[in-house]
Amino acid sequence: MLRQTQPGGRAPQTLLLGVGADPRQAALARAEGADLIDVRAATPEALAAIRVSLPADVLWTDPRTDPLCADPLSAGLLDADQLAAAGAARRGGAAGRVTPAAVIATAAVCSWLGAPVIRSRHTRAVRRAIDMTASIAGRRPPSRTVRGLA
């Protein structure tokens, strides 16, 4: 699902890929605003239950084991959780300890740079960051317009 834009064209909407290894987690990610659900870690039984409860077009079943593969920019999918962890490791932070704020900030930057898909377990917060970034960039209309008359 790699989307390209023409030079000078508007960047397409960034999609949020939530993580759903079981039916409850998948339903929660969808309810919190995930456009797609990553079901690659689901067991066959859980996958069958997820397929019953969610539309097939929202399930991500890409066979690649690592969505960042060798070249994250050519993959078209950026994992905000993994990118934030890599940044923390480069700064000398504790391995495996990433704050939600770092994940949200990483998702906002990726969205600003035009990433077509961002994957995260922090679905609600990352959805808000993607929407905020799109609004600031002018790619999303405001949810409510208030006009004041003096």
What are these regions (language model features)?
Residues 1-32, 40-150:
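Active-site-adjacent loop and "lid" segments of alpha/beta metabolic enzymes
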